[in-house]
Amino acid sequence: MKRILLLSLPVAMMVACSNPSNGTKTETTPPASTATASAPAAANIDGNLLGTNHWLLDNAVDASGKRIDALFVRADKPVTLDFKDGRLSVSNTCNHLGGSYTLEGNALTVGPMMSTQRACGEPGVMELDRLAGDRLQGKLTVRSLDAAGLSVATASGDVLTFRGEPTPETRYGGTGERVFMEVDAQTKPCSHPLIKDYQCLQVREVKYDDKGLEQGKRGAYENFYGNIEGYNHEPGVRNVLRLNRFQIKNPPADAPSVAYVLDMVVSSELVKK
């Protein structure tokens, strides 16, 4: 049997204590008299609502109202927050960041953050780890929260505004099935009813037990006609992926009945032609 160590982000485990909310839009209290609290703060934070979306950074200003441009060096990949299973994780920085958090009233308090350790060559991206981490650690005041957006204020007066995008679990109405799939280094031409000269990923399923031991022998590669959400194939690199597979309710006649969403890349191997 071949053993593959399943990698995971070294983020701190945590327990989220949330207060119930009677609606999807959080009620607000009158604004404080300080300059940094010009908008009302949320009276209670709906912890369940936090977990239904990915939260993509849409705007960030300092206490004087000046845009914090350094947080937007990756215009096509905004800094993103995810609240899931008692964890806050931060992605689209250089490294993945994560830390524990608690909810009380209108306060979202984030503990010290841990991160993966990798270098990034893009200008300004390495600095994102510090810029985002410093602003998200400590006590944040939630100014507003609904399905469309989240706005928080830091102790120093910075205001970060995020737009909400539903998670796959929210979009597909349930928890996906965990599967592992090996994607070969090169695509191959395949016959597609709608797309001329289509190139298919070459995939095969990989099975592990709960200890990470591979079970059985891998079969032959097969054409994969769909897309894997969140996965960008790099020719010449063979990957083992951990995926969530969702059943699509009432798909159109010419559309797939299942959706695959990338959870993590388990292993990668550079393959020479």
Task: Label each PLM-derived region with a short phrase.
Residues 18-234, 238-273:
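Lipid interaction determinants
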Residues 1-4:
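Positively charged n-region of N-terminal signal peptides that target proteins for export
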Residues 13-16:
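C-terminal motif of bacterial Sec signal peptides marking the signal peptidase cleavage site
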